[in-house]
Amino acid sequence: MLQNQRACQLVRSKTGCEPLALAVAWGARTAGRCAAGVLGAVKHQRFSDQQLETFAARAPGICPKPVCDAGEPCPLPPQDDAVDVSVIVPVHNGERFLRACLDSILHQNTTRRLQVLAVEDGSTDGSGAILAEYARQEGVTVLHPEQGGSAARARNTGLARAVGRWVLFVDCDDCLLPDAVETLLAAQARTGADIVQGGWQYCDEADIRGAVQQYAEACYTGPRRLDVVELPGTPWGKLYRRTLFERVRFPSGYTCFEDAMIHFWVFPRAKCIASTKPVVYLWRKNTMGLTATSQNTAKALQAYWVAEEMLDGAVRLGLPQDALFACNLILQLANYCYVCVAGLPEADRQTAFACCCLLYRRWAAKLPDPRTLPYAVRLAQRALEQADYGLWQLQGRLFQLIN
């Protein structure tokens, strides 16, 4: 829907004028689709089957596939009816912003009872001392995982101790706005949703706030179900029914892009997903964060490997291979993988592309008719099906306009 489109969000953030934002978004989408149609007809660079196999064989040498914890995850602990929301905070070398993060959680304008689970993941700065101080406050528990090394494992450690009816994830360099908990719970009460996505705002390392990202007041059910792919796959900024994580954990071996599991494993298990317009979260653009620093390194190929992980998990969980599944798979292999590897050398980008095409081919026969999918997904699907490297790059660059 246009309200969720990036152009709409940016214009709304700058002007506060909803009609103007919608008009610009409609114009941007129309222009983007026209450009995609024209350029997509001429910018072909198709790979042969032999080229796909040759390039794909290079992938393990560039970035080996991460190894995740084997077996079924432990059951979630019993729910404590006295706890409304469990807030999980993975912490790794976050001393600079950690106090602001924890204070934003503890000083919420709410009478709800919160369980704050701060997971100390092998920090080498002063984060441990700060956490020891906050651990003396009521409702704050500091956890030390036996095996750490990733935000995925840290979040999983928190889930293993979470007893609230609802779960929030907050990164240690980010903050909740003062009314975040009440805003999200109120939206849940109105809609009956299992997941509620709130708005968020950029914040730099000097605490200067930037563009606001807001979403429609909407429930993504029935005809709107596929619009849920417009919501970000980030763990933060959302309220989750805790039971959605039964048998589901973040892929522990991944140091980046582990949040793909939100779209692949968590969203499909929700009967109703809603979004609400108010901003509830400040996301700090950390230039030294794992995602930012990985996109120009070989680790960016984890964006492909995690797709394999997601498909294996979907089979294990018995999730339907329906239109939403197809959208998630195609967009992961096309748009998202392209964005993640765009900063790599050309040969490595081609390796990622070849892997994506071959994985799509293995699943294509199980997916619904692509003609039933949204335009942006159909364009991405065509790039994968035809092994068209030129179109794959084009749709990746234009996705924010054509979606």
Regions from the language model: what does each represent?
Residues 104, 120-129, 147:
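A conserved acidic beta->alpha catalytic loop
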Residues 89, 113-122, 141-145, 172:
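Short beta-strand/loop segment that forms part of the nucleotide-sugar
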Residues 167:
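Short aromatic/hydrophobic "clamp" motif used to bind/position activated sugar donors
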Residues 93-107:
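Short, well-formed alpha-helical segments that are part of the catalytic scaffolds
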Residues 280-286, 293-321, 333-366:
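Catalytic core of nucleotide-sugar-dependent glycosyltransferases
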Residues 2-69, 123, 343-403:
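Membrane-interface aromatic/basic loop that binds lipid-linked glycans or pyrophosphate carriers
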Residues 145-162:
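Glycine-rich, basic loop-to-helix element that forms the pyrophosphate-binding segment
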Residues 172-274, 283-298:
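Donor-binding/catalytic cores of nucleotide-activated saccharide
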